[in-house]
Amino acid sequence: MSDSDDSNFSEEESEHSSEAEEAEEAEAEEERASAAGSEKEEVEEEEEEEYDEEEEEEDDDRPAKKPRHGGFILDEADVDDEYEDEDQWEDGAEDILEKEEIEASNIDNVVLDEDRSGARRLQNLWRDQREEELGEYYMKKYAKSSVGETVYGGSDELSDDITQQQLLPGVKDPNLWTVKCKIGEERATAIALMRKFIAYQFTDTPLQIKSVVAPEHVKGYIYVEAYKQTHVKQAIEGVGNLRMGYWNQQMVPIKEMTDVLKVVKEVTNLKPKSWVRLKRGIYKDDIAQVDYVEPSQNQISLKMIPRIDFDRIKARMSLKDWFAKRKKFKRPPQRLFDAEKIRSLGGDVASDGDFLIFEGNRYSRKGFLFKSFAMSAVITEGVKPTLSELEKFEDQPEGIDLEVVTESTGKEREHNFQPGDNVEVCEGELINLQGKILSVDGNKITIMPKHEDLKDMLEFPAQELRKYFKMGDHVKVIAGRFEGDTGLIVRVEENFVILFSDLTMHELKVLPRDLQLCSETASGVDVGGQHEWGELVQLDPQTVGVIVRLERETFQVLNMYGKVVTVRHQAVTRKKDNRFAVALDSEQNNIHVKDIVKVIDGPHSGREGEIRHLFRGFAFLHCKKLVENGGMFVCKTRHLVLAGGSKPRDVTNFTVGSFAPMSPRISSPMHPSGAGQRGGFGGGGMSRGRGRRDNDLIGQTVRISQGPYKGYIGVVKDATESTARVELHSTCQTISVDRQRLTTVGSRRPGGMTSTYGRTPMYGSQTPMYGSGSRTPMYGSQTPLHDGSRTPHYGSQTPLHDGSRTPAQSGAWDPNNPNTPSRADEDFEYGFDDEPTPSPQGYGGTPNPQTPGYPDPSSPQVTQPYNPQTPGTPAMYNTDQFSPYAVPSPQGSYQPSPSPQSYHQVAPSPVGYQNTHSPASYHPTPSPMAYQASPSPSPVGYSPMTPGAPSPGGYNPHTPGSGIEQSSSDWVTTDIQVKVRDTYLDSQAVGQTGVIRSVTGGMCSVYLKDSEKVVSISSEHLEPVTPTKSNKVKVILGEDREATGILLSIDGEDGIVRMDLDEQLKILNLRFLGKLLEA
């Protein structure tokens, strides 16, 4: 017997033997196989190849059978030759074997024998490791088991697919018919058909339809389920919304019927940095930011603000009442993780790279909690964090996307592109390509590319485009925190745009997609239209503030204490209009809204601004040079001084006698509380609260010499004694200008113009200028200094009778014409210790000279300069001489200067009376109605006699003291170097050099270098330090006062100065210059 016969015999015998003999036969077979050697293996391989070829031929001849159990087995059988599938079969072989052993006991003997033989063959195959045989075995075995299950009832459960197939509609089921319906009435129509069906249900002609479907996504159609079309027509007959579809109904194909009712579950596609809220637990309703998503594990990692119960940690560490407190649940507040505090309470905080570990939770270095949650534990739809929540997550909330849109399957992403926007491609092959949007159609954007090789329009999805801007673009914020604001782009970063707000002058950091090119400027009105920027609002019954920033949900309000607070729109109420509010500054001047003031004390000392609002003792000012809070700041009114006067106010808003000033000094015809009550022409005459028209000035060409329109030339269209309406040549704009700021073109006079009505007299020897009120003389000293019954500055005589004439109706030298400015009505406004007045004379007699408002001039003076006498005056009353004529005040009585617009102090100096100031001397800071060129100093050392009126030739002689004396305070200004004169009482300070820090009235705050201290010295005890060549100088007198420059050279008493403002060279008298402190 050959070896091959022996092997065949062993195989046949092993197939009919019991399981107990299989192991012994296998061992014997292994021994014989090892003895046979390689010859046996070659013979077996040849036989196996022949066997395989025969089986393949039989398989080709055999017709293919249709599988009864789905396509899974055939798919695996078709790709059986691939190596990867064989590995998969090997991995599952043991599971199949166990399954067969379990099921073997439940089938008949035939199947049991086949399975046993198959198990033995599987063992042999595993032992010999023949891959082809293993693949063939699994293919046959798996297919056989499936057939066995189907034939012998091994599994009664069908797959889900087959189960769903049984539910599909067939030809015997009712059909769906589409019926055209009125758009927007689909649901109401379906309900109407249901009611009609119920109404006809128990009648002789019930409706034959089965159902009505009105899907949300289908507009203009409804679906009616019925067997026949006639049944549909019967049901919809008489329904108004279905009238258009009565004659035409279309049947839905059977294959498409399931799509009508198919509901697609929206799978939330969460992305990092999006926002969610927690549903339950200790973090219920808390906002959280997505860190990363694990869809395979259905988990999401969130960044959130932790809630750590420090009391629980403290109690647990102390073991005191721990078990009692453990049962009490108290939701701890949100607070960032503080490792130091945890350690101080005894907690154990570990470090793991960039995170801190406490009680199994991970915390970032900034204190945020990073924790994983199940997808079902969070709310993802419609989550919009509030502004306060955003501020907790990031210092600059604008960096976070406020309008979080959770994208869903089948839902287009929202965008805000508009035609005309500049965009660039951010995804795809054409990335970084720039272009301009031509049209927008839903989610499709058509652009014209900015490329030399691309001339045709291109279409992109919205998500592939983003807006781009360049520096200098003027844009408007269309979404986000600063919605509605406009500004200029100053910087463009990678994901942000920095723009400078037009309204608040703040830098705003905004996302590019929230911007849009625009040319207009923000109106400064909030979204509701109830509040605007700069408006006075009330925060509580005792606190007011001004809106300095408008945001989408909140306001930033500068309150009366200088603090900027953030409040919601509903928390503020609009304050009552206070345009007519009046307050007093540090020098008891009347200040109103729109007045220009200077701050002399407090944190904003040195600033100038316009009053926007007055409330009690606080003033809200606006300064164009201040960037913070849009130029708005607040200070107390006692820290202000009226600087440059106020803007023209509409005098028609003030009724006659509506305001009685509290200060006894403030009473002039400008405020008609005085003369208006006299009811006649007395007290200054014809003071009615409005000016008389001046026809002489109308039509003349003038130049504006002061103010924001300095240098402009125009034609006077209308004029009163105080203001003029000027049409500018350059801009064709008509503006109101104070007459003191006007100069007639071609006139040789360098100073401002003078009203013919004598409201403010010309320089030299006339009634005192603005700020003196109705008192004459100015500053409490008279000319001559002694015996005040003499005629001082021509105009201090106030006759008690015949007070109804003015210079406009009679000559200036008329002895019967009293030309003194109006005095106050109320007697108590003058001191009771005024100079006594002799008894009045009858008509035609000598007028009664009277000088109200100042104490007895016999009081000792600090200095006694030369006192000129009035020539040719015989003795009168207390004097050696008297004048037979009442010397009038030329041009001086239509309306004297308005007191509230004075800048300097009128009350006598607290350190003693000062020397005589000429009424025409230059004042420190006159009102806008009093800006005049500085008078030239007297060419001689003595003061000439004072005539009664300007000479016809235009020469204007000076009064005593009108020269530039160092004792006057009109030259005083800040930052210049001064020297303390010998007249100062403190001998230690005499002769020292200092710098003027601030000026209040006639008092100067001077920093002395030698003694290194700040002292308050009256201006009469100071003299300016004369500058030398190359010194930094400041103009202290003249029309260029307060201007700075460099002294280039000196020529006698004049100096050549290069001005800092316009780089022009000017020749100025050295007396007009003060030396600035060297840096």
From Swiss-Prot:
Disulfide bonds: none annotated. Pfam families: KOW (PF00467), KOW1_SPT5 (PF23042), KOW2_Spt5 (PF23284), KOW4_SPT5 (PF23291), KOW5_SPT5 (PF23290), KOW6_SPT5 (PF23288), KOW7_SPT5 (PF23287), KOWx_SPT5 (PF23037). One of its GO terms (biological process) is regulation of DNA-templated transcription elongation. Residues 753-784, 859-882 have a biased composition (Polar residues). Keywords: Activator, Nucleus, Phosphoprotein, Repeat, Repressor, Transcription, Transcription regulation. Interacts with SUPT4H1 to form DSIF. DSIF interacts with the positive transcription elongation factor b complex (P-TEFb complex), which is composed of CDK9 and cyclin-T (CCNT1 or CCNT2). DSIF interacts with RNA polymerase II, and this interaction is reduced by phosphorylation of the C-terminal domain (CTD) of POLR2A by P-TEFb. DSIF also interacts with the NELF complex, which is composed of WHSC2/NELFA, COBRA1/NELFB, TH1L/NELFD and RDBP/NELFE, and this interaction occurs following prior binding of DSIF to RNA polymerase II. Also interacts with SUPT6H. It comes from the Eukaryota. The keyword Iron does not apply. Residues 746-809 are annotated as: 9 X 7 AA approximate tandem repeats of G-S-[QR]-T-P-X-[YQ], motif CTR1. This is Transcription elongation factor SPT5. Component of the DRB sensitivity-inducing factor complex (DSIF complex), which regulates mRNA processing and transcription elongation by RNA polymerase II. DSIF positively regulates mRNA capping by stimulating the mRNA guanylyltransferase activity of RNGTT/CAP1A. DSIF also acts cooperatively with the negative elongation factor complex (NELF complex) to enhance transcriptional pausing at sites proximal to the promoter. Transcriptional pausing may facilitate the assembly of an elongation competent RNA polymerase II complex. Residues 1-89, 664-700, 739-970 are annotated as: Disordered. GO terms for cellular component: DSIF complex. Residues 888-903 have a biased composition (Low complexity). Belongs to the SPT5 family. Phosphorylated. Phosphorylation by P-TEFb (CDK9) at Thr residues of the C-terminal repeats alleviates transcriptional pausing and promotes transcription elongation. Phosphorylation may also stimulate interaction with PIN1. Bulk phosphorylation occurs predominantly in mitosis. Residues 310-417 are annotated as: Interaction with RNA polymerase II. One of its GO terms (molecular function) is mRNA binding. It comes from Gallus gallus (Chicken). Transmembrane segments: none annotated. Residues 849-858 have a biased composition (Pro residues).
